[in-house]
Amino acid sequence: MNPIINLILLSSMIAGTILTMSSHHWVSAWLGLELNTLAIIPIISKTHHPRATEASTKYFLIQAASSALFLLSGITNAYSHGTWDMAHLTNTPSKIMLSVALATKLGLAPIHFWLPEVLQGTPMITALIITTWQKIAPMALLITTWNLIPPTITLIMGLLSTIIGGLGGLNQTQLRKMMAYSSIAHLGWMITITTITPSLALFNLTLYILLTTSTMLIMHLTLSKTLQNTMLIYSYSPTTASLFLLSLLSLGGLPPLSGFSPKWLILQELTTHHLTPLALLMAITALLSLMFYLRTSYISTMTIPPSTTPLKNTWRLKSNSNTSLLSSLILLSLFLLPITPLMIQ
């Protein structure tokens, strides 16, 4: 793709997200979502591969349907109460339609089927954009309208997402599909706490973006697409393999790494608000996600494939990759736990 066109598309995507985050009007929020969607579709299909074309078509159809439902929710509320302000959402059908529309855009269960298939048909960097940047605008709308959406719907969707994200990831050998189910599980934690403490959901989203970015950048750097490919990471670079291990364990929420803090705080808030059974179920489902992170960690750091090549330590060869951004992201994703109380005050 032409670099100028690529820059224009990325700028449009950023502008759409900022427009949605800063708007309180239904039409301007919808316009930002549409701008975001139309900018990412050429990026998904830029490889001209049949899988990329299929992924872009699926993404377009599901996002168009959810945007139409989002706009219908605003029209219904405006017809009933004569206002386009999102803060005055009082119509019950509009609340339900808004919940379903945002859940579809985020890829929450039970409307999650499109996310693994779309990620599998895209390059790793594009998959990273879909799982991180494309979640910001819908989550901003969800946090903006947290007190207007029925809490029962969000709690059920959150619990379903954590269960399906954990179970779905166990059966995957493709890393992009595994990260898709990881995204579904993490979004389940976010949407669950949104109805209780929106600021904690924002903190969780920030850490999720850091952890996912560092993990998927290592996958991109080492050209890993399947679990079998991760066996070569140690031969490529023992340091990278160790950091990949720590990033995965942090993504799974294992203490004392940074990924433990949002799960710990969310479980604490749920028990404080007398939702102990829900907190117990979510803690159990977190073990499912941790299982496939541990499996990937074991394969990438403790197994080396059989080879007849004399030179296995390719890390001795000089690499031309620039890893300065990756290094800073990994440091943030691993060692933010000690300053967690300062960040959530």
From Swiss-Prot:
Gene Ontology molecular functions: NADH dehydrogenase (ubiquinone) activity
A GO cellular-component term linked to this record: mitochondrial inner membrane
Chain segments annotated as transmembrane: 1-21, 25-45, 59-79, 96-116, 123-143, 148-168, 191-211, 240-260, 274-294, 324-344
InterPro entries hit by this protein: Complex_I_Subunit_2, NADH_DH_su2_C, NADH_UbQ_OxRdtase_chain2, ND/Mrp_TM
Keyword Translocase recorded: yes
Main location: mitochondrion
Localization: Mitochondrion inner membrane
Membrane topology summary: Multi-pass membrane protein
Function per UniProt: Core subunit of the mitochondrial membrane respiratory chain NADH dehydrogenase (Complex I) that is believed to belong to the minimal assembly required for catalysis. Complex I functions in the transfer of electrons from NADH to the respiratory chain. The immediate electron acceptor for the enzyme is believed to be ubiquinone.
Family: Belongs to the complex I subunit 2 family.
Protein name: NADH-ubiquinone oxidoreductase chain 2
Gene encoding the protein: MT-ND2
